Amino acid sequence: LSKVLVIGAGGVGSVAVHKMAMNADIFSDITLASRRVAKCDAIAESVKTRTGVTIHTAQVDADDVDATVALIKQVGPKLVVNLALPYQDLNIMDACLATGVHYLDTANYEPRDEAKFEYGWQWAYQDRFRDAGLMALLGSGFDPGVTSVFASYIKKHLLDTIDTLDILDCNGGDHGQHFATNFNPEINIREVTAPSRHWEGGQWVEGPALSHKQAFD
């Protein structure tokens, strides 16, 4: 991939560019962009201190497709990694189509005025990306994403058969605060208050938020 543009300078964006800098043989040229460039500069300073790698920074309002297109043309990346808010997914996908650049995100699109989990908005882009010869890798955060890689590795290298697979997503850390989230607080609250969905009896079953519990050892 070599040259990559990361949009979004929150907690996830910070972790991502630090990890990219640790793998400079793959990500040899990194640009971090956000609406507030001061956040990008602070992260870039941390990356330099921790890894010795210099990353570029830029300002962009990802709600503005034309501005995002202009930045992509200026940077010339092979891949745009969208770590901004889910509200901006479609705008950034439009910008990637306009510039002929591959796309990756970690969270599915949601409209600003409605907390609704729905893949269809982004899946509707499939033909356009395919016809343009471009990749759009969606939802490759932790669940799914990292957990899928873990499960595939276990299946391929460690176990002969798998009967069931339970994925427990929790945070064992302590921020020392009464309330702290792992990523954008608004999105986090949307997720935990949304109707729950689980796979049971060969189909998806939906229920009220926080209506199911499971004990584990």
Region annotations inferred by a language model:
Residues 4-11:
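Conserved N-terminal Rossmann-fold NAD(P)-binding element of oxidoreductases
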Residues 107-134:
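Rossmann-fold NAD(P)-binding glycine/threonine-rich loop
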Residues 49-64:
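Rossmann-fold cofactor-recognition segment
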